[in-house]
Curated annotation (Swiss-Prot):
Residues 369-400, 552-594 are annotated as: Disordered. It holds the Pfam family zf-C3HC4. One of its GO terms (molecular function) is zinc ion binding. PANTHER family: RING FINGER PROTEIN 207. This is RING finger protein 207. It comes from Oryctolagus cuniculus (Rabbit).
Length: 594
């Protein structure tokens, strides 16, 4: 069964309305019929609880507390107190039969009916005047019908004697015969009904005061919790608004920096693309010129005789030398890598918003939250993904933050005379003094608390006033030291900024060195590929020369065995001898190497 019977409280004023009538069942909303009391002190009608028992337990429909039930009925015991209140209430008045006229009185007559305690009979208003008019009935005790249960002495069901005593030990009423049956020790706990009534009223008053105090504390707790619920809602709204505002600001900053970075990348791309295309166009016009001169050289060697060779050969050699010695931009003037340092740029644009310095993982705000006792914001640090372009570089690994004492000792052990080291020395002295005073106060307060709780010793007010005064003075000293340390932030921030710029410059130079070495490696691989492509043609020309001029066989063998020598000679501007040999085939041309 659901326990949602009462509506949620809307405010402190709804507490009284939510309590309901004490004689009305909260389930059926009618007057109790055989009210049953649960262990949680909630009452319900026996009919309302019937059928709710499971495994010998019944769950309270209001608070869901489990109550163990015993007996074949499967119901909790009847609440005798609440049943008495129900029977004594106005709604529980039974039909009245007058002892004189034996007629049922109407509801209006029942309200004016009386009861003669002396006769022990109910009387209607008319019969009371008729039967008790004589002087002999003047001493009869006549009360209202509703007061009869309070004033009439009840009788013992065992001995049919009126109750005269009350046992404070067994909490039971006793007649004279019950009193005689008790032992001597038990009789000492028996008092008359009037005294027992007075004592019971006093104890009941004390219990009522305790319940009222608990009621007042409960109302205050409810008011406090309702205020905290409102405060939590308001705090959640403020936090959500701050998150949205920060997120929007971060998006705006990132979008602006993204546009600038993309613009810078596009500018670098256009610049490098234009430079490479211009150089490629120059080399594209140079390659046919070289091809033509090689064909001219081969044709000249095959067609010219010795006289023609000596007449025009040196002119051809000068032309070839001029072609080779002209400045040609064979090496790329720029690298093909476009670097925008986007990670550092994004971090730099987010630094003012997130209060994260480039040299510290968490800012001063996180430390302040930790000192204040708050949980502080939890920063989710994920593994940094390496850039697909910058494969050589790696993200710096964040070292775990050392405790303050250990890190300070390590810093002071280095022996460097820096402003921060001098500040740490001064801070350690001040901190140890403040820590010693706090520990002294703590020990003194703990000792006083132990004397007060365990030994119940009397503590003078002067001692407490002195401790309070020392605590306030120590608090002022801590505030002063905190302000002094906080005032050094600007000085150290400038020093840290200079160090960071120096480290950033060193990192940039280091990355440039790696890029230069990588570029040299690429150029060397390109030259190796070109050499492998030229080697077969060098060997072919050497074999042709060997067949035409046997005297050049030795030199041709040397050149075929060492093709790298011919390649180096061509790089130095010297014409290999194999290219000047007559009979070279014009079709033996080196491939186009791009």
């Amino acid at each position: 069964m659901s326990g949602a019977i009462f509506a949620p409280l809307e405010g402190p004023g709804a507490l009284d309305a939510a309590s309901g009538h004490p004689l009305v069942c909260p389930l059926c909303h009618a007057q109790y019929e055989r009210p049953c009391l649960l262990d949680c002190f909630h009452d319900f009608c026996a009919g309302c609880l019937r059928g709710r028992t499971a495994d010998g337990r019944v769950a309270c429909p209001l608070c869901q507390h489990q109550t163990v039930v015993k007996g074949p009925s499967g119901l909790p015991p009847v609440d005798r107190l609440l049943q008495f209140l129900v029977d004594s209430s106005g709604d529980g008045v039974e039909a009245v039969h007058c002892a004189n006229c034996d007629l049922d009185c109407s509801k209006q007559d029942a309200e004016t009916a009386c009861f003669c305690n002396t006769c022990g009979q109910p009387l209607c208003a008319r019969c009371r005047d008729e039967t008790h008019r004589a002087r002999m009935f003047a001493r009869h005790d006549i009360v209202a019908l509703g007061q009869r249960s309070r004033d009439v002495l009840q009788k013992c069901p065992l001995h049919a004697e009126p109750y005269l005593m009350f046992s404070t030990d067994k909490k039971s009423l006793l007649c004279i015969r019950c009193f005689r049956d008790l032992q001597g020790e038990s009789r000492a706990h028996c008092v008359d009904l009037e005294s027992a009534y007075v004592q019971g009223c006093e104890r009941l008053e004390q219990a009522v005061l305790a319940v009222k105090a608990l009621q007042a504390a409960t109302r205050e707790a409810i008011a406090l919790l309702q205020a905290m619920v409102e405060e939590v809602r308001r705090s959640a709204e403020e936090e959500a608004a701050a998150i949205h505002a920060l997120f929007d600001s971060v998006q705006e900053k990132l979008a602006e920096r993204k546009a600038l970075l993309l613009q810078a990348v596009q500018s670098q791309y256009e610049e490098k693309d234009q430079a490479f295309k211009e150089q490629l166009s120059h080399l594209a016009t140079l390659l046919p010129t070289l091809q033509i001169h090689l064909v001219i050289c081969s044709s000249f060697l095959s067609l010219a005789n010795k006289a023609e060779f000596l007449d025009l050969g040196y002119e051809l050699m000068e032309r070839l030398q001029g072609v080779v010695t002209r400045p040609h931009r064979l090496r790329p003037a720029q690298s093909s890598k476009i670097a925008s340092d986007y990670r550092a740029e994004f971090a730099r644009c987010l630094e003012p918003l997130l209060l994260l310095g480039p040299r510290r993982a968490t800012g001063a705000q996180g430390g302040a939250n930790t000192l204040a006792g708050g949980s502080g914001p939890k920063v989710l640090m994920g593994p940094s993904c390496p850039s697909p372009v910058r494969k050589v570089s790696r993200s710096p690994v964040q070292k775990p933050t050392l405790p303050r004492s250990i890190s300070t000792k390590v810093l002071l052990a280095d022996g460097e005379d820096t402003p921060f080291a001098e500040h740490c020395r001064h801070y350690e002295d001040s901190y140890r003094g403040l820590q010693a005073e706090v520990q002294n106060l703590k020990d003194q307060v703990q000792e006083l608390h132990r004397d007060l709780t365990k030994h119940h010793s009397l503590i003078r007010a002067e001692i407490m006033a002195d401790i309070l005064h020392r605590s306030l003075r120590l608090d002022a000293q801590i505030d002063s030291e905190y302000a002094s340390v906080e005032g050094m932030r600007a000085v150290f921030q400038e020093i840290w900024e200079e160090s960071y710029q120096r480290l950033a410059g060193e990192q940039e130079i280091y990355e440039a060195q790696l890029r230069d070495l990588f570029q040299l490696k690429q150029e060397n691989a390109h030259l190796t590929t070109i050499t492998k492509h030229i080697t077969p043609y060098v060997r072919s020309i050497a074999k042709v020369k060997e067949r035409l001029e046997p005297r050049f066989q030795a030199s041709a063998d040397d050149e075929s065995e060492n093709p790298q020598t011919a390649y180096d000679a061509s790089r130095n501007g010297e014409t290999p001898a194999s290219l000047l040999l007559p009979g070279s085939v014009a079709s033996a041309e080196p491939p186009f190497v791009n």
